[in-house]
UniProtKB/Swiss-Prot annotation:
Region (N-acetyltransferase): 248-454
Residue positions binding Mg(2+): D101, N224
HAMAP family the UniProt entry points to: GlmU (MF_01631)
Pfam families: Hexapep (PF00132), NTP_transf_3 (PF12804)
Record localization: Cytoplasm
Active site positions, chain numbering: H360 (proton acceptor)
Record pathway: Nucleotide-sugar biosynthesis; UDP-N-acetyl-alpha-D-glucosamine biosynthesis; N-acetyl-alpha-D-glucosamine 1-phosphate from alpha-D-glucosamine 6-phosphate (route II): step 2/2; Nucleotide-sugar biosynthesis; UDP-N-acetyl-alpha-D-glucosamine biosynthesis; UDP-N-acetyl-alpha-D-glucosamine from N-acetyl-alpha-D-glucosamine 1-phosphate: step 1/1; Bacterial outer membrane biogenesis; LPS lipid A biosynthesis
Record text on subunit structure and interactions: Homotrimer.
Function: Catalyzes the last two sequential reactions in the de novo biosynthetic pathway for UDP-N-acetylglucosamine (UDP-GlcNAc). The C-terminal domain catalyzes the transfer of acetyl group from acetyl coenzyme A to glucosamine-1-phosphate (GlcN-1-P) to produce N-acetylglucosamine-1-phosphate (GlcNAc-1-P), which is converted into UDP-GlcNAc by the transfer of uridine 5-monophosphate (from uridine 5-triphosphate), a reaction catalyzed by the N-terminal domain.
Catalytic activity: alpha-D-glucosamine 1-phosphate + acetyl-CoA = N-acetyl-alpha-D-glucosamine 1-phosphate + CoA + H(+); N-acetyl-alpha-D-glucosamine 1-phosphate + UTP + H(+) = UDP-N-acetyl-alpha-D-glucosamine + diphosphate
Protein name: Bifunctional protein GlmU
GO biological process, one term: regulation of cell shape
Record InterPro entries: Bifunctional_GlmU, GlmU-like, GlmU_C_LbH, Hexapep, MobA-like_NTP_Trfase, Nucleotide-diphossugar_trans, Trimer_LpxA-like_sf
Length: 454
């Protein structure tokens, strides 16, 4: 059956106390609406319609994509009214309705929900709660068939004792939806057009109302304030941590890991506390990551070691290489096999060949180093003249003395050496020793200045 999806994302989110539309607040570094859209895409619908209202322009700008149709709800008159705004664009046999502030919904749950939809049967997602206060109750008859959904403010005392609640997520036969929405009334305590009223209409029309429940109740937890946002964040991170551990990762404290993207891991990986993984991160077998590291869009090859307090972005570490502590590898940084970058070393668009080392206190930008090079402490590649960037190229087995300034564009040949304290401005041929510093002078009988007495 053909499928279209409507995502309701028009709410203001006043309890968030924020200028940012609620659905753009993040879970794991991604807007809540982004999580819902990603899940919806896995169902391969013909189209996804996003109903927007408060902050509509910003939501459209942030989430724009070719497969999304944004529909404006100028006035927020209830969920039924919101879905009605998408009606002119709907033609599929099935329509699935989701919510932009329910970010943890899972594909398996939605597939089970949709499997129950036929031309004469709709399906809604429910969950049992110990404290259902504030939620719409699922009213069933003596045989257990769903009869209606009653919102909390409209419920009788007896109905408020019901623990099964409406999540708002439902799937309906597309040909029936327009008729039901056209019959909605706002004669209720909220003065709104409730989408949930279509359940009673469906029953009255002789349709069967099926139901499904998520395996994890947190899947359908919505976000109305920052506390709920934090709860979902921690729940999401716990799930990701458990997933990594099942794949062979040792987490020294699963509660102190943040995953904010797509992570691929090998076996026998060890991750210390307070590590943040962002974007697309590939971690191969036997990698070790120390505490307080941030790793974004990077590849860590087999046996690589990241020591404490290091920051990697757009970097690749070869087999058996290591970085840190306090190393910063910016986009385009590549360490060859067994290469080493030590404390307070920054790389940017720089490649270190196999076995090369930059032990400490150096900046290497727009540089290409061959194999088995040694970079002395305090070395800087001077790659920018105020207008353009230039490259520094070192051959194999180059030894750079401490406190060197390598002024690009510059080439240093295989086996060359530069003396400590040098400013190197011209090409150094292979196996040459280059000095680029003032000759030392010693002044005899030097007397230190004395303080002036007043």
């Amino acid at each position: 059956m053909s499928l279209e999806i409507v995502i309701l994302a028009a709410g203001q989110g006043t309890r968030m106390r924020s200028a940012l539309p609620k659905v753009l607040h993040p879970i794991a570094g991604k807007p809540m609406l982004g999580h819902v859209i990603d899940c919806a895409r896995q169902l391969q619908p013909e189209r996804i319609h996003v109903v927007i209202g408060h902050g509509a322009d910003l939501v459209r700008e942030r989430m724009a994509a070719d497969d999304l149709n944004f529909v404006l709800q100028a006035e927020q008159l209830g969920t039924g009214h919101a879905v009605a705004q998408a009606l002119p664009f709907l033609s599929a046999e099935q329509v699935l309705i989701l919510y932009g502030d329910v970010p943890l919904i899972q594909l398996d749950t939605l597939q089970r929900l949709l499997a129950q939809v036929t031309p004469d049967q709709l399906s809604l997602l429910t969950v049992d709660m110990l404290d259902p206060t504030g939620y719409g109750r699922i009213v069933r008859d003596d045989q257990g068939a769903v009869q209606a959904i009653v919102e909390h403010k409209d419920a009788t005392p007896a109905q408020r004792q019901i623990g099964e609640i409406n999540t708002g997520i439902l799937a309906v036969p597309g040909k029936r939806l327009a008729d039901w929405l056209g019959r909605l009334s706002n004669d209720n305590a909220q003065g709104e057009y409730y989408l949930t009223d279509v359940i009673a209409m469906a029953v009255g029309d002789g349709l069967v109302v099926a139901s499904a429940q998520p395996l994890d109740a947190m899947e359908v937890q919505g976000v109305n304030d920052r506390m709920q946002q934090a709860q979902l964040e921690r729940h999401y991170q716990r799930l990701r941590a458990e997933e990594l551990m099942r794949q062979g990762v040792t987490l020294l404290d699963p509660q102190r890991l943040d995953v904010r993207g797509e992570v691929s891991v090998g076996r026998d990986v060890l991750i210390d506390v307070n590590v943040v993984l962002e974007g697309r991160v590939v971690i191969e077998d036997d990698v070790r990551i120390g505490p307080n590291c941030v790793i974004r869009d990077s590849v860590l090859r087999r046996g690589a070691v990241i020591k404490a307090n290091s920051h990697l972005e757009g970097a690749e570490l070869g087999e058996g290489s290591d970085a840190g502590p306090f190393a910063r590898l910016r986009p385009g940084s590549v360490l060859g096999a067994r290469a080493h970058v030590g404390n307070f070393v920054e790389l940017k668009n720089a490649r270190l060949g196999e076995g090369s080392k930059a032990g400490h206190l150096s900046y290497l930008g727009d540089a290409e180093l061959g194999a088995n090079c040694n970079i002395g402490a305090g070395t800087i590649t001077c790659n920018y003249d105020g207008a353009n960037k230039f490259r520094t190229e070192l051959g194999d087995d180059v030894f750079i003395g401490s406190n060197n300034s390598l002024v690009a564009p510059l080439k240093i040949g295989d086996g060359a050496t530069t003396a400590a304290g040098s400013t190197i401005t011209h090409e150094v041929p292979a196996k040459n020793l280059a000095f680029g510093r003032a000759r030392q002078k010693n002044l005899e009988n030097w007397k230190r200045p004395e303080k002036i007495r007043k």
